[in-house]
Regions:
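A phosphate-binding catalytic loop at a beta-strand-loop-alpha-helix junction
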Residues: 375, 379-382, 443-461
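Membrane-interface helix caps and helix-loop-helix hairpins in membrane proteins
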Residues: 124-129, 170-179
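Membrane-interface loops
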Residues: 28-46, 71-166, 190-194, 202, ...
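Alpha-helical transmembrane segments that form the membrane-embedded catalytic/substrate-binding core
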Residues: 138-139, 176-196
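Hydrophobic alpha-helical transmembrane segments
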Residues: 55-66, 83, 136-141
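PTP/DSP superfamily signal
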Residues: 199-294, 364-370, 438-444, 458-506
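Cysteine-based protein phosphatase catalytic domain of the PTP/DSP
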Residues: 114-121, 295-371, 431, 435-447, ...
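N-terminal transmembrane-helix/juxtamembrane module of multi-pass inner/ER membrane proteins
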Residues: 1-64, 108-109, 118, 262-274
């Protein structure tokens, strides 16, 4: 078995290396045949020193790249590593062909080991293939591979320091200009996002709902607007304006999420955390999402009790509850909840029937797990794990496919509001159906999204109808009487009622 794996590793290395040198050489040749190849750099880069010794860490990436093949523990890990490297090569090659750039600065004469390494590099390299820096892309991909394997803290620190030195060396060896570095970092993070080493890869699936394309168009428009502002600002004001292109990239990725990838573009894992690659790429959008939540929630209650022990509210309150069902894709969970389930959904989109079913199932399990007398919550959390449901969230990398076309988003109007007798009756229904309520054990469960008005309310409505026998209007009236600003789409009733029928037939 080990011999077979070793042969697979060796063959993979030979094939990937051949593709690397063939494609890299081809794009260099194409660029050298062009009459005028542009060069982009900042004036301050003239002050960057040439450190001949930094060719050693620069070259070390080649060794680490190759060694990684033989550190893969099985064929699955080897396949993931190979596909990451090939994805990096494809992305870089496409940019080298479409946007050829050069680095024209002459290197000082160097002797000794550094001179030998520079001469070896010059044997196959030309001053082209600049942005995004393939060296930086591979630094991200290969670095993530090694960090994943490191266990000791000191080793992780040493690896981060060494790979940072590799990244710096592209400047101090006069191999690249600065602009090649952030573009390379972005491309490397994108590779890790679409093809992670753990979990399922990002799934491509065309959205079937008009609402998702409308939001995709909005974010794509914001992407173009911020890109225009970045370029224009750099021309008439300062090169610092180019950092707006980071926001442009984040908006473009969110647009792709609405149109193709679903909530998986946020890569929120079962512990309620965004993976590092997604966090880096989407950072500007995530900051804006938090500002937006702050704006809409200012002066308002962050959560409200709907039924005894069962609350609806913002994910910002999640740390104060014993158990949480989190429906927000764009927010990370606060620390605190002992039992946590993640079911990420896109904002401003009506949950699909499948999402509603999974959300209702998760909530029912949380109710039975949390809102009952005599259970030791920490022990229960330990038995279940921090994400007890194998069905929930991005932990298993599943992108939910939306199957029906949604109507325009609007508040669903129903006649009347729940009066006190209806609320009392609702409490009794909950108490009778659950047997032992949270009133007797003091435990609290939160169903949440960004604001606690849309996605989480939809899931709670589905649970009340399917598992607690509420009529849709009664459930909605109860929610609106307890938490203002509830906003659900006009198509939600049909989806929940269809789900209730489907559930009753099982």
């Amino acid at each position: 078995m080990k011999t077979k794996l070793f042969l697979s590793q060796l063959v993979a290395l030979v094939v990937v290396a051949a593709i690397f040198y063939a494609s890299y050489g081809a794009t260099n040749a194409l660029a050298s045949a062009c009459a005028n190849v542009p060069e982009i750099y900042f004036a301050w880069e003239r002050a960057v020193p040439f450190w001949a010794w930094s060719i050693v860490p620069y070259w070390s990436l080649n060794l680490l790249y190759a060694l990684g093949f033989f550190l893969c523990r099985n064929s699955r890990e080897l396949a993931r590593y190979v596909t990451q490297l090939l994805a990096a090569q494809i992305i870089a090659t496409l940019f080298f062909i479409v946007f050829p750039l050069q680095m024209s600065w002459e290197k000082p004469a160097v002797s000794g080991l550094s001179g030998f390494l520079f001469s070896s590099l010059a044997a196959f390299d030309l001053p082209f293939n600049q942005a995004p820096s393939l060296h930086i892309i591979l630094c991200v991909v290969v670095g993530a591979f090694y960090l994943r394997k490191a266990r000791a803290v000191w080793l992780k620190v040493a690896l981060v320091a060494w790979f940072a030195l590799i990244g710096l060396s592209v400047l101090t060896t006069y191999q690249h200009h600065f602009i090649d570095i952030p573009t390379g970092l972005a491309a490397g993070c994108f590779v890790l996002l679409v093809r992670p080493m753990d979990g399922e890869p990002l799934r491509f699936a065309m959205a079937t709902e008009t609402a998702r394309y409308k939001w995709a168009a909005l974010y794509l428009g914001l992407a173009f607007l911020t890109l225009f502002a970045a370029i224009t600002g750099a021309k008439i004001w300062s090169s610092w304006a180019l950092w707006l292109s980071w926001a442009s990239l984040s908006f473009a990725l969110v647009a792709c999420g609405y149109a193709f990838f679903g909530a998986g573009v946020f890569a929120k894992n079962g512990q309620g955390r965004h993976v590092a690659a997604a966090k880096a790429l989407l950072f500007p959008y995530l900051c804006i999402a938090r500002l937006n939540a702050f704006f809409w929630l200012r002066g308002r209650r962050l959560s409200d009790e709907i039924l005894p022990g069962l609350y609806l509210g913002s994910v910002k309150q999640a740390g104060k509850f014993d158990a949480v069902l989190d429906c927000a894709a764009e927010f990370e969970r606060p620390d605190g909840a002992q039992i946590y389930a993640s079911l990420p959904m896109l904002d401003m989109i009506t949950p699909s029937v499948d999402e509603l079913k999974r959300g209702a199932d998760e909530l029912e399990w949380l109710v039975k797990t949390t809102l009952c007398v005599g259970e030791n919550l920490p022990q229960m959390a330990a038995k279940l794990g921090s994400n007890f449901s194998a069905k929930a969230g991005y932990a298993n990398g599943r992108d939910l496919k939306f199957r029906r076309q949604a109507d325009a988003r609007a508040n669903l109007q129903t006649s009347g509001a729940a009066n006190e007798s209806e609320i009392g009756a609702a409490k009794q229904i909950f108490a009778n159906s659950n047997g032992r309520t949270a009133e007797t054990n003091g435990k609290k469960l939160l169903v949440c999204c960004a604001l606690g008005y849309g996605r989480s309310a939809s899931v709670l409505l589905a649970w009340m109808v399917i598992y607690r026998g509420f009529g849709f209007d009664d459930a909605l009236n109860l929610l609106k009487s307890r938490r203002e600003k509830i906003a659900v789409s006009s198509s939600l009733r049909e989806r929940i009622e269809r789900l209730a029928v489907r559930t009753s037939e099982i």
